[in-house]
Amino acid sequence: MGLFIKKPLADLMTEANDSGSKSLKRILGPWSLIALGVGVIIGAGLFSITGAVAAGYTGPAITLSFAIAALGCCFAGLCYAEFASMIPVAGSAYTYSYATMGELVAWIIGWDLVLEYCLAATTVSISWSRYLVVFLEGFGVHLPQALTACPWDGGIVNIPAFVIVVLMSILLIRGTEGSSIFNGIIVFLKVSVVLVFVVLGWKYIRMENYTPYIPTNTGTLGEFGFSGILRGAAIVFFAFLGFDAVSTAAQETKNPKRDMPIGILMSLVVCTILYMLFAHVMTGVVHYSAFAGQNGIAPVAIAIDHMGQMDASGVIRPDYPWMNRAIVIAILLGYCSVIMVTLLGQSRVFLSMSRDGLLPPLFSHIHEKFRTPARSNFLFMLLVGTLAAFVPASVAGEMCSIGTLFAFTLVCAGVLIVRKTMPDAPRSFKTPLVPFVPIAGIITCLVMMLFLPADTWIRLVLWMLIGLDIYVCYGIKHSKLEHMQKHRSGQTTLDMIGITLSVLCVITGLWHQQTVGWGESKVLLIISFVFAFTHLAFYLYRLGKQFTSLTR
């Protein structure tokens, strides 16, 4: 079968039903899964992008943007729910692809997920450090920049970012039950802050702030009007990402076939309702134009400052000034759960890949006492912690988004395939309106990917090249599906993929430089060229070697 050999569904179900001392402990129920999803979806995005999008693109109609973005995510969520009920294994999109599209595609998406979770945890850890600094400054405590920023941001080492990664990793190493309880408490607190904002702010809504609900387009595509709503949807779409991490906890769920679809879909529903209520109150309390030019959570502070009564001089005295600090606390708590869930997802994907032989056995070792992949968690603690301590957030930023969207695309495509190839396979949940829903999910994700900048594509291609190297040198030789074969078919295909990625590396490098200007820094262009030509030489050499052996 070569590169596209598929993992039999029977093998996956055997793996899913494993309950020995070296298996993951099943302790999660539907409420825990919903909390897991809400925990990873709601970060600072709700507080930081709502005002900016309303001011620049949508006006009060940002609620419609949230609804459209949620619908787009729902397409992928329904596909994930079907797979999670059909193949309740920890590997998420990696495992689903292995069963439907074969080993090579599974490796690509698994390697992509590792990038997604690693960079998400890194980026959020750095942001957590920044908000901690802001929070402590409110009490007169000033941490030195040398110890709260990386060398590229004017510091030496980001100690708070490293510490939060270590703390969340220790929680995960000691067991899913404890980390689940901790996550549940955090989710309760941050959802409470959002609801308090909505409830207290509702009585200060002024209907004139909703007029016009959809501001007239400025004449530029995407600035207000219907096109502005769509552009706003493309931006807030990324505030919903993360629900896919729920599917990585399948083997720690008591009844995964029933509970996984509930956890995935209900977490999306809960977050959509909270997002729309928050945006409705925020744009109702103060006119959306007041948010223009404000960064971070400043627009939320403006809304809170307008929650009060106007005195004789026409100045509004805020009734709830303490809410600004509560929002920062909610962000700090929210980031803790995001870091924890992304670290969990990362180790579970590596666990599945290692069990299939594509990665060393180290990553599939289960601690007999804690029943967790402790060694894998420890390794990622060091990796993510080091990145968070020494790498600027701007480097990691949008990479996690493109990784997630790529995974969504393949999962939606997988549903189309599995309906044809395994129509009778038992599944407790079926994606409705097939093929419309999967196709709509694919189109939505591809469109969102096109909105991402060129440097994001460069880093994705570079990461794929590194992943291909590991698969060529290790994975293809140790795969358990064809472990008896010394030489597997498909080597020429791998070489052609390597050559294609090398060419794409050059193209994306030139595209990025053209976008930012030829007078700007050429670091990414140089890196892409070095990667491209070294890999081009390597895979051309391999291809020539195979051709020579065939002609003898």
Task: Name each model feature, range by range.
Residues 3, 25, 46-152, 270, ...:
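Extracellular loop-to-transmembrane helix junctions
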Residues 47, 112-130, 235, 240, ...:
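Membrane-helix boundary/coupling elements in multi-pass transport proteins
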Residues 129, 156-207, 264-268, 400-410, ...:
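Membrane-interface loop-to-helix entry segments
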Residues 1-49, 55-60, 74-78, 87-90, ...:
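Membrane-interface "cap" regions at the ends of multi-pass membrane proteins
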